[in-house]
């Protein structure tokens, strides 16, 4: 998880062996992935951020084409393509041209092609960027299902992507790891840093904004409730310590505009 420009795509390309690290190593079962070479790539599935497919191909024909590139025999490729098209919810439109697909449907074709070789590791670079809320929810549910049997490495700047599917999160900024852990571990680290403050008017909002970072503003009939974060304890009379959310963590480390895509 990280804002645009944090280095997520670079990292995904390195894990997929498409880009060599300038220093350090990436290990799989204790061995450098670049020395494992084809033995490593044979167990990896990859969906790049800018995935596209031949638009005149049908979804099934495209998967059969990718299967041929992977060296699969026709019968195996056909059986696998049908199975995956059912998994991603595209079996009923398998013979439809990809040019007629929505962005979310194309991403699901991308997931299917990445799963053709039964990968042990599935690498997904910003897979939900640009999708509408319904397609994004469908995509997250699909990832939860796939993740039962496959290691899924997902990069995103969208908080809701990882809140519902990730077992562990690495937050990066400017190519550096800021923190790493389970959701509970990361949220526990934010305890005592998130507060609710109720004010009466806009001038009080501005006063709070000058002192603390505001995560959200909820305007009610009689008052305005501010959700704020602070590294130090807030002793204002109207401040109430509340349980942290992942949005608070993101706001604590990154800018507001990166956290508002939901």
What are the residue ranges of the model-derived segments?
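Helix-to-loop junction immediately C-terminal to a conserved catalytic motif
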Residues: 16
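Conserved ABC transporter NBD signature motif
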Residues: 24-35, 39-40
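Conserved ABC ATPase "signature" region
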Residues: 64, 68, 75-93
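Conserved ABC ATPase signature
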Residues: 97-101
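A short, proline-enriched helix->beta-strand linker immediately N-terminal to the Walker B motif
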Residues: 116-120
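Catalytic Walker B motif of ABC-type/P-loop ATPase nucleotide-binding domains
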Residues: 122-126
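ABC transporter nucleotide-binding domain
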Residues: 138-227
């Amino acid at each position: 998880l990280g804002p645009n420009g944090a280095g997520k795509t670079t990292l995904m390309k390195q894990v997929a062996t498409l880009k060599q690290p300038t220093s350090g190593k990436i290990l799989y079962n204790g061995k450098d992935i670049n020395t494992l070479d084809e033995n490593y790539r044979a167990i990896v599935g990859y969906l790049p951020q800018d995935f596209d497919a031949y638009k005149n191909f049908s979804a099934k024909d495209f998967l059969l084409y990718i299967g041929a590139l992977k060296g699969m025999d026709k019968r195996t490729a056909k059986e696998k393509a049908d199975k995956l098209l059912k998994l991603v919810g595209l079996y009923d439109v398998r013979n439809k041209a990809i040019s007629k697909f929505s962005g979310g449907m194309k991403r699901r074709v991308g997931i299917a092609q990445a799963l053709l070789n039964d990968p042990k590791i599935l690498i997904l670079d910003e897979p939900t960027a640009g999708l509408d809320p319904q397609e994004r929810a469908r995509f997250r549910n699909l990832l939860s299902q796939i993740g039962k049997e496959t290691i899924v490495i997902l990069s995103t700047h969208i908080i809701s992507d990882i809140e519902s599917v990730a077992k562990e999160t690495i937050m990066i900024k400017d190519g550096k790891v800021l923190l790493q852990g389970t959701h509970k571990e990361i949220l526990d680290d934010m305890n005592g840093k998130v507060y609710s403050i109720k004010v009466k008017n806009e001038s009080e909002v501005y006063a709070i904004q000058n002192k603390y970072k505001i995560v959200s503003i909820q305007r009610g009939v009689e008052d305005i409730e501010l959700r704020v974060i602070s590294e130090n304890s807030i002793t204002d009379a109207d401040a109430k310590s509340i349980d942290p959310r992942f949005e608070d963590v993101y706001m604590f480390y990154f800018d507001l505009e990166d956290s508002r895509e939901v």
